[in-house]
Amino acid sequence: MSHKIQGGSVVEMQGDEMTRIIWELIKEKLIFPYVDLDLHSYDLSIENRDATNDQVTKDAAEAIKKYNVGVKCATITPDEKRVEEFKLKQMWKSPNGTIRNILGGTVFREAIICKNIPRLVSGWVKPIIIGRHAYGDQYRATDFVVPGPGKVEICYTPSDGSPKTVYLVHNFTESGGVAMGMFNQDKSIEDFAHSSFQMALSKNWPLYLSTKNTILKKYDGRFKDIFQEIYDKQYKSQFEAQNIWYEHRLIDDMVAQAMKSEGGFIWACKNYDGDVQSDSVAQGYGSLGMMTSVLVCPDGKTVEAEAAHGTVTRHYRMYQKGQETSTNPIASIFAWTRGLAHRAKLDNNKELSFFAKALEEVCIETIEAGFMTKDLAACIKGLPNVQRSDYLNTFEFMDKLGENLQLKLAQAKL
């Protein structure tokens, strides 16, 4: 390349353990040699989050709000063991949750597909992108054990002082049982709808919302009605212009349809459905190491991309002992490419758009040419049958990607 591409403003969040090492390699070998970025870096390592009382996470989220593009390395969400290991002041919350709460928006997961990596669902030749509405429902519910016979009622008391409304949930006559009250908010459902419609337009794929509105006529019916109203008023003409569509589906029909389909659609799920189906779909494609995660805000303008996997602690322990590792960097690389592609779209930067696409193609072409990490070799041959000659180690694979990217960009005469 005769010159560096001017990339614009990007917020970068460093992470923990093996993914932190890979993150630095990605910047050094694949990004910085070709792209000149106005980079705003935040160290989200567990040590720095502890040192700053997690203020660094909030600062990073505010920076994403300002610059509209964030790329994030995987981070540790501490449990009791981690609190002990790092002598933390407290059990800090998930950085992803903190960022999502500040930005709003919906998390969309998408599989990265290579022809030579077998899929459990062989018919899925295109990704299925799942958008999970990560607010409310069972996750904010009040549930309790009903100790014995009696009535369970739900009461709504209007804040304007008008009469309250009481609904009978169940009259327990012979014994107790269990009960739950859950909720969602129109504003949150509206934001979920906008993020989903924006994602469909950007991918140029159809969108399906799944609910069980035949049973939960009012509750799930509200999701269905809000989506339909927003679609008809604000998105229908854009969808038709792009020759894509939006449809509501019953969750059981949708699950069956997804299994039979070839992929190539966005699936908007309520909170619990999204929790379950995103893992089920991820497994169907074969590997979490090949799964991207993108937070899309309702404005369609603000995006944060990351890998859908963790910090790969087991490999980091090996790395610390000086042992060889073969850690898959693909999802972390795609966090960068998705972030840069969005930056390119916002700025109408054709060179940057080409670069992001070229780097994604290099990743897939390299694997399809037989150069891969151990986890992918295991997908093909089965772990007990994998020999050392079947895969590259962490650093060899990054070098191979670097070589192939250099070749591709030279051929393109950028």
UniProtKB/Swiss-Prot annotation:
Post-translational modification as stated in the protein's UniProt record: Acetylation at Lys-374 dramatically reduces catalytic activity.
Coiled-coil annotated residue ranges, if any: none
Localisation per UniProt entry: Cytoplasm, Cytosol
Xref: InterPro entries: IsoCit/isopropylmalate_DH_CS, Isocitrate_DH_NADP, IsoPropMal-DH-like_dom
Residues the record lists as binding Mn(2+): D252, D275, D279
Residue numbers carrying Phosphoserine: S389
Protein family (similarity comment): Belongs to the isocitrate and isopropylmalate dehydrogenases family.
Protein name: Isocitrate dehydrogenase [NADP] cytoplasmic
Modified residues (N-acetylserine): S2
Top-rank taxon, per record: Eukaryota
Database matches in Gene3D superfamilies: Isopropylmalate Dehydrogenase (3.40.718.10)
Quaternary structure and partners: Homodimer.
Primary subcellular site in the record, as a coarse category: cytoplasm
Required cofactor(s): Mg(2+); Mn(2+)
Function: Catalyzes the NADP(+)-dependent oxidative decarboxylation of isocitrate (D-threo-isocitrate) to 2-ketoglutarate (2-oxoglutarate), which is required by other enzymes such as the phytanoyl-CoA dioxygenase. Plays a critical role in the generation of NADPH, an important cofactor in many biosynthesis pathways. May act as a corneal epithelial crystallin and may be involved in maintaining corneal epithelial transparency.
Primary enzyme class: oxidoreductase
Signal peptide (from-to): none
Keywords per UniProt: Acetylation, Cytoplasm, Glyoxylate bypass, Magnesium, Manganese, Metal-binding, NADP, Oxidoreductase, Phosphoprotein, Tricarboxylic acid cycle
Phosphotyrosine, modified sites: Y42
Annotated positions binding NADP(+): T75, I76, T77, R82, K260, G310, T311, V312, T313, R314, H315, N328
